[in-house]
Regions:
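Conserved SAM-binding motif I beta-strand of class I
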Residues: 15-16
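Rossmann-fold cofactor-recognition segment
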Residues: 27-38
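Conserved Rossmann-fold cofactor-binding substructure of NAD(P)-dependent oxidoreductases
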Residues: 36-51, 60
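Rossmann-fold NAD(P)-binding glycine/threonine-rich loop
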Residues: 78-101
Length: 354
């Protein structure tokens, strides 16, 4: 909804969703209730549009992107899927399609910042810490999900890849917890998550890179218990003669508990630290984001959504024209535009240079 409303200020926007209930919340925007997991439905729908903005659950993200590219339409996407997006690069080039992936906050804005500095300095270290949390810390979960619950659970089981001394290291998710202090928030806990994604390939010249997720301290313990007990497993088990995947049951049970209710507020926190040499001198840059629920809009929707709409504007206005799959770091040259676009909408990144 945030993205549709923002884009509708300057463009003719149509929102498509499988849920009529979701569409009913959008005032003054054209809506179509349809199932975009069906290729034919999707490709017929997008025939007369200049740009597709994708925001679907991860399990259907890759296929949706492929279907859009096959139809020859430009796409800017924030869906987080486990498949390698570069698998669609050849197809996108054949079809002459501009396809920008992972256009959220991290991956997303973090990559744009990285790409911007990579063109100006020799980076040796990149660290990104990021989390979206409820302002009110409540037992037992101390967490609320603004994404599809199965995507959140996926983060807790997908092995985390990071780069140390130019070697890729894989560890299990939720490992290497650290307590970290943040102004205005206090102590949060970080742990390894698989957020580097495309950077492992595109920034292979940077010897040290890591991305970690932030939660309230102690949250990791119960997640590890649930994981070790099999609640996040995709392998079917038989219960009273019915075969079910434990992860589906867990998502079903947790979603109402994790869902943000009316009156709930969230915040997004991100800290990026880059170290290296610039003009022959050792430097470090630290970017800090603390964004809070504002104007009845979820912070995570603002921080991810406005990054995506900034890039959508660049593509639809012909200012970003690189054909093929583009991870956000390729848009480093448009950093100032995206940063200003976010600032105009109240999402402010503060930078400290040392």
């Amino acid at each position: 909804g945030v993205m549709a409303k923002d884009l509708a200020k300057q463009h003719n926007v149509t929102s498509v969703d499988i849920s009529q209930k979701n569409l009913d919340k959008l005032e003054g925007i054209n809506t179509i209730c349809a199932d975009v997991s069906n290729r034919e439905t999707l490709q017929n729908l997008i025939k007369y549009f200049d740009l597709v903005v994708g925001a679907v659950p991860g399990f259907m993200g890759y296929k949706m992107m492929k279907d859009v590219i096959e139809a020859g339409k430009n796409i800017v996407d924030i869906s987080f899927y486990s498949e390698d997006p570069f698998g669609l690069d050849k197809l996108a080039k054949e079809k002459g399609v501009v396809a920008v992936m992972d256009c959220g906050v991290a991956p997303g804005m973090g990559n744009i910042i990285f790409g911007h500095h990579d063109s100006k300095m020799e980076i040796t270290d990149y660290e990104c810490l990021v989390g979206g949390l409820p302002e009110k810390r409540e037992w037992p979960y101390e967490y609320q999900a603004v994404f599809s619950p199965i995507d959140v659970i996926e983060e807790y089981i997908r092995p985390a890849r990071y780069v140390q001394n130019s070697h890729m290291i894989t560890k299990e998710a939720l490992s290497d917890t650290e307590l970290i202090e943040f102004d205005e928030i206090g102590t949060l806990e970080s742990w390894n998550s698989d957020g580097l994604r495309s950077l492992i390939k595109t920034m292979a010249h940077v010897p040290n890179m890591i991305e970690k997720t932030l939660r309230y301290p102690g949250c990791v313990e119960y997640l590890k218990v649930l994981r070790a007990s099999g609640f996040f497993s995709y392998d079917e088990v038989e219960v009273n003669g019915t075969m079910i995947r434990p992860v589906d049951m867990t998502a079903k049970l947790l979603f109402p508990k994790w869902e943000m209710k009316k009156g709930d507020k969230d915040f997004t926190v991100m800290r990026i630290i880059m170290k290296g040499k610039e003009n022959g001198k050792e430097v470090s840059y630290q970017y800090n984001l603390l964004d809070r629920f504002d104007n009845d809009t979820i912070s995570m929707a603002r921080t991810t959504g406005f990054t995506c709409t900034a890039v959508a504007n660049l593509v639809v206005n012909g200012e970003y024209e690189r054909v093929g799959i583009s991870p956000p770091e390729y848009l480093g040259g448009h950093f100032e535009f995206v940063k200003n676009y976010l600032e105009e909408r109240g999402v402010k990144y503060k930078v400290i240079k040392k």
